[in-house]
Regions:
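A glycine-rich helix->loop->beta "capping" turn
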Residues: 18-21, 40-54, 60, 150
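Substrate-binding pocket helix/loop in short-chain dehydrogenase/reductase
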Residues: 63-64, 71-76
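Active-site helix of classical SDR
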Residues: 87, 129
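Residue(s) in the substrate-gating loop at a strand-loop-helix junction
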Residues: 113
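C-terminal helical subdomain
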Residues: 153, 173-262
Length: 262
């Protein structure tokens, strides 16, 4: 829940000005009851539920050795529980509709991050939450397919109220344009549409630089099981020599900064 609901109401006003129908909800989506009210409000207002976009978030960036318990808990609660709670109540609604014999073509679109997929210094709390959302997306897609619901995620890079003070500010109008949320909206809109019915369990990177599919964890080099820890050194070294290097924040192999010991 944000402290200022006026941006949400502003969007409502814009939608209504174009002839659409909208309603703002100020409940805390990381609370069980608040998330339930959110879903009920949508169903009561529009008569049905077609898509849920989980996009609430906060930042409490800090190096691990300096991070407080409150900074950890706050980020995990808003991002991770704030994705689970609305999704859970939406899933129950669609399950009940399906069991009642009614047609269901539902969508859940979650918000992950390249920080959660690839890792970014100073964001153990945020990255852990966003990685959790990516895994949540994969598992929820398997569970909800039987009810006619797809679950995907978007890992965006854009300037918003949350990120505008994160990192160097764009120096030119072209750089600002490249980080505009307008590059994120199309993939979210498409995933919410009927055209995306065959796509589920995926994470899409989206920015002014690229639209890509993050392919997730895959098993790399293997070795037969070893039951003696004193013999593991050479085995691990051999596997590491064949393994792909971790991707960096740009998603490319080998661009992840290698840890340095002083």
């Amino acid at each position: 829940k944000g402290g200022d609901e006026s941006p949400a109401q502003q969007v409502v006003n814009e939608i209504e000005a174009m002839g659409g129908k909208a309603i703002a909800n100020g409940d805390d989506i990381s609370s069980w009851d608040g998330a339930e009210r959110l879903i009920k409000t949508a169903v009561e207002t529009f008569g049905d539920l077609h898509a849920v976009v989980n996009n609430a978030g906060i930042l409490r960036d800090r190096m691990l050795a300096n991070m407080s318990e409150e900074e950890w808990d706050a980020v995990i609660k808003v991002h991770l529980k704030g994705t689970f709670a609305p999704s859970r109540h939406a899933a129950a609604y669609w399950r009940d509709q399906s069991k009642a014999g009614k047609p269901v073509d539902g969508r859940i679109i979650n918000t992950s991050s390249v920080s959660g997929i690839y890792g970014n210094v100073g964001q153990t709390n945020y990255g852990a939450a966003k990685a959790g959302i990516a895994a949540f997306t994969t598992i929820a897609s398997l569970e909800l397919a039987r009810y006619g619901v797809t679950v995907n995620a978007v890992a965006p890079v854009a300037l918003t109220r949350m990120t505008e003070n994160l990192g160097p500010a764009p120096e030119t109008e072209a750089e600002r344009e490249q980080r505009s949320p307008k590059w994120i909206a199309p993939i979210v809109t498409w995933l919410a549409s009927t055209e995306s019915a065959g796509i589920t369990g995926r994470v899409f990177e989206a920015s002014g630089d690229v639209l890509a599919i993050a392919e997730g964890w895959h098993r790399g080099p293997t070795h037969k099981p070893v039951d003696d820890p004193t013999k593991l050194g050479p085995v691990v070294e051999e596997m590491m020599s064949k393994a792909r290097l971790n991707a960096g924040m740009d998603g490319r192999d080998g661009t992840w900064p290698q840890p340095q010991k002083k």
